[in-house]
Amino acid sequence: MKATQMILVASLAAFAADANGKWTAVFDTQIGEQNYTYEFKSDGKKLTGTATSKGNPAVQIEEGKVDGDKISFVENFSYQGNPIRIEYTGKFDGADKIQFTRKVADYAVEEIVANRVK
């Protein structure tokens, strides 16, 4: 029985994704190509860090969570004087790739891929 429990615990730990570090994504949007760098730090299920689009200052991510192979956070910033909320939900695809759905306020929903910088 104890051996079964230990195997279960070990297998669950293997599914916990490591979000820590720098990630990049380049993707097309309604306003043109976007080039992003994300810097993540996870502590248990809590995720903190920054999202930086090329040519703009870093934005602190909010509401960040990592749960197994799932990741989510919010990027709030101002574009041409208008507040914009971008909601990210994603799933790790191996150790070095995250498949994200990015909901940009009521304007767009985008599928993007972030790759770990090694």
Segments from the language model and where they lie:
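Central antiparallel beta-sheet cores of small beta-barrel/beta-sandwich binding domains
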Residues: A17-D93, Q99-K118
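Hydrophobic h-region of N-terminal signal peptides that target proteins for export
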Residues: V9-A17
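Absolute protein N-terminus
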Residues: M1-K2, A16-D18
